[in-house]
Amino acid sequence: MPENSFISNFKTILKLVVFLIIVGVAFNKIGAKYKAAADKNIINAFTQQRYNEFYEQEPNSIDMVFIGSSHSYCTFDPEIIDPILGTSSWQLGTPLQHYDTSYYVLKEVLNYQKPKKVVLELYWDILKDEFEMKQANTFFEVLKNQSLKDEYIKNVFPLNEKVKYNLFPIRYQQDYFAYEANEIQTKIEEKYGVEKKATPEIVGTEYYRSRGYTFCDVVMPENEYNETNQFKNFDGEDWEFNNVQKKYIKK
């Protein structure tokens, strides 16, 4: 009887191990697929180019850096600013950059350069957030400093976000579903001859230029005014400066 009980328990454990292996393999495959979709994001490509070129610069050849979100890297153009101020500047903004990330961007800059001036772009809608995984991951994708990345995760990530970060399907799900939805729509249109509802023509262009700057003169279509309007239903009395972001700005 004890032997039968042992065999039964062993079979149960074996089944559990096999199940976990299958789940692990499937999870890894899904994660790789999701990451591949994220790699096709053109905004990520601009960020990658911005940082790749920064790492190629001669040490201590940059005396001013711009740090912030897309508001920064689409606004402060070193090609215009440097001839006027006599500076040698670089744009190091990243999409949706929060100020915990700004702090670590500057720490990485100081490993290679000794800028005399640092221009930090502030945006009210980001100042109220405690943490945002996607913007942190965008920075990690271009950061060539594992110890700094580990320090960021240890000091900034809430516990539940540390778990999510190590699971690719969760980390990259936003990129994947945005990419996949577009692919599915295109295939349906081609297969069934379905005509999608006409959307306003996008006026303007966006491209990476130089020294971290991204040129963008795209005009927002009218149909997006309500969808992306951050001031819609906004009451300034309810706005609060998040303590986490405040802490990193004060640093």
Could you tell me what each predicted segment is?
Residues 1-11:
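N-terminal Lys/Arg-rich, disordered targeting/topogenic segments
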Residues 32-53:
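Alpha-helical transmembrane signal-anchor/signal-peptide segments
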Residues 49-55, 244-251:
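A short, well-structured juxtamembrane/interface segment
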Residues 48-76:
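Short extracytoplasmic
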Residues 138-250:
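Secreted/periplasmic serine-hydrolase-like ester/acetyl group-modifying domain
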Residues 67, 71-158:
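Membrane-embedded segments
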Residues 40-45, 67-68, 94-98, 240-241:
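Short, flexible loop segments at the rims of nucleotide/cofactor-binding pockets, characterized by
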Residues 11-32:
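Hydrophobic membrane-insertion alpha-helices, especially the h-region
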